[in-house]
């Protein structure tokens, strides 16, 4: 079983200036000041005894094909890492998962990628996780 724990964060200033639409058109670039909190998003990944995919969050999904998952961030992280069958993924948050402004969806995406890459036998570095999570989050919105 793989367990990943990713901190949530609070941004003090500069939110949005780290997006390409801003910093690519600005001669000053972008700068965000934020702080990680002692609250986390926990992700577990474990092998199933069949080829189905089970995802537990505020809901439970069990599908034969990961493409049928409703949870877009989980589905896209699975696609990117190549872990697409015979797996159980569970997410648990120390905070409410919507509307807190603490970057919980970003922390979830990083945690998913970290756990799934590790499950697949890879060791992603922080830059890879950040780039992949950013890509998933931007494409999802």
Model-derived features: positions:
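Alpha/beta catalytic cores of group-transfer enzymes, especially the acyltransferase/condensing modules
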Residues: 124-141
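ATP-binding N-lobe of GHMP and related small-molecule kinases
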Residues: 1-104, 114-124, 135
């Amino acid at each position: 079983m793989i367990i990943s724990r990713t901190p949530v964060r609070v941004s003090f200033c500069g939110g949005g200036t780290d997006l390409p639409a801003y910093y690519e058109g600005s001669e000053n670039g972008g700068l965000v000041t934020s702080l990680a909190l002692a609250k986390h998003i926990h992700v577990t990944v474990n092998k199933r005894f069949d080829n189905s995919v089970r995802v537990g969050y505020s809901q439970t999904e069990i599908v034969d094909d990961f493409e049928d998952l409703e949870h877009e961030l989980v589905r896209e992280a699975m696609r990117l890492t190549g872990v697409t069958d015979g797996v159980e993924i569970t997410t648990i948050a120390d905070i409410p998962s919507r509307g807190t402004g603490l970057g919980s969806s970003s922390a979830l995406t990083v945690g998913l990628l970290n756990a799934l890459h590790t499950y697949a036998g890879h060791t992603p570095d922080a830059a890879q996780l950040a780039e992949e999570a950013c890509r998933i989050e931007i494409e999802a919105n």
